[in-house]
Amino acid sequence: MALFRKKDKYIRITPNNSLKGSVSHNVPEVPDELFAKCPACKHMIYKKDLGLAKICPTCSYNFRISAQERLTLTVDEGSFQELFTSIETKDPLRFPGYQEKLQKAKEITGLHEAVLTGKAMVKGQQIALAIMDSHFIMASMGTVVGEKITRLFELAIEENLPVVIFTASGGARMQEGIMSLMQMAKVSAAVKRHSNAGLFYLTILTDPTTGGVTASFAMEGDIILAEPQSLVGFAGRRVIETTVRENLPDNFQKAEFLQDHGFVDAIVKRTELRDKIAHLVSFHGGGQ
């Protein structure tokens, strides 16, 4: 029996569907591409505030940029001549899903492979230039990446040019097995021939530079620069900690840590790299 049920002390409101629809219709939608979250300070940033260099205005974190964006920041306008575009990536091991991954990377980046190679001018100084793009299968080094960089050094020897490489990589490309690992030795041999010719080689380490690229040509430059807070190393942090059974410093494998221990010559802000490259190339004989 519900003869003595207490009355509710609140009223019930039935939503007015027509009113609800009109309210939601007037709420402005913010496009996803307008803002970016800084991985370092976690702040939401209006993308236009990042500028062309894509540097966080709050903490100065350097966002990862594409090879084309790097090219725009670095070389004299209209001076870049791309080379070795006809070299095609093969699938010698018939690795499952590799062809699809390659095609997707090409569509995302507009590149044929993980490295952009060519000749360019930087403030009037001619250089042989390679820029690795981490958006292309994490800039992993396969046979084509190794071949393009090797040919770049060979061209630089023939034309008496300095070589400048912006490195970024997750390491050797597992889909190509031992052939990807062989690129470490092949490129290093080309670096040696270039050095024997008395020519200048400059590397700029960007985030991330790891694995086989670090263990070969990334650390073989006559001068090694790095962008602030770039991750640079061979094996991963957790792998090392598990192996040595020790806790590593918080800044371990950061560019600043490597500079303190003599592996990097200087940390250079992204906005100052163009001037620094031109100065170093000119100081070491130039490229005219």
Curated annotation (Swiss-Prot):
GO terms for molecular function: acetyl-CoA carboxylase activity; ATP binding; carboxyl- or carbamoyltransferase activity; zinc ion binding. Its EC number is 2.1.3.15. It catalyses: N(6)-carboxybiotinyl-L-lysyl-[protein] + acetyl-CoA = N(6)-biotinyl-L-lysyl-[protein] + malonyl-CoA. Zn(2+) binds at residues 38, 41, 56, 59. Gene3D superfamilies: 2-enoyl-CoA Hydratase, Chain A, domain 1. Acetyl-CoA carboxylase is a heterohexamer composed of biotin carboxyl carrier protein (AccB), biotin carboxylase (AccC) and two subunits each of ACCase subunit alpha (AccA) and ACCase subunit beta (AccD). This is Acetyl-coenzyme A carboxylase carboxyl transferase subunit beta. The gene is accD.
